[in-house]
Regions:
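Divalent metal-cofactor coordination and adjacent catalytic microenvironments
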Residues: 1-159
């Protein structure tokens, strides 16, 4: 569920009309993903969405554990050593990805004004700088204001 309406996106990017609505929706998704990745937390529109995601964690963890055990058992019965090694590596990668996703939900956050403002800043920046090459400017990965707004809520401090 998007954290901003299309009307809010249009106002943020100073767009009159609906001609860029599809692009704005895509860029909003990118801005939300970027904020969540920077925070290393899942971002939810309200407490009920966070609570629902938390309620699903135990069943998801059990299913992931069963899938991992099944993959390891299949690898153990594989006669080709290289194939078995690859099967174990894939199982580990899947397990780690699911653990990361579960951890992000476990430490999820309900959006607040700072997170929404950061998402708006990133949306505006993505819309204004849609091209890969900018003339006369230096490209940055995230607007400085967005980082400042998100930093207090970030789980893992780093660059």
């Amino acid at each position: 569920m998007p954290l901003l309406t299309i009307e809010q996106c249009r106002r943020q990017c100073r767009v009159d009309g609906d001609y860029d609505d599809d692009l704005l929706s895509e860029l909003l998704g990118s801005a939300e993903d970027s904020a969540a990745a920077y925070l290393n937390r899942a971002v939810f529109p309200d407490q009920s969405a966070l609570s629902a995601a938390l309620a699903e964690l135990p069943a998801g963890a059990a299913a992931a554990a069963e899938e991992y055990a099944s993959a390891i058992a299949a690898a153990a019965s594989e006669s080709n050593a290289e194939m078995a090694k690859a099967m174990v590596e894939v199982a580990l990668a899947k397990r780690d990805a699911l653990a990361l996703a579960r951890n992000r939900v476990l430490h999820g956050i309900v959006v607040n004004g700072s997170v929404v403002a950061a998402i708006r800043l990133m949306l505006g920046d993505l819309y204004a700088n849609r091209e890969n090459t900018m003339v006369g400017a230096v490209a940055v990965e995230m607007p400085a204001g967005a980082k400042a707004l998100l930093r207090p809520y970030r789980r893992v401090m780093g660059p």
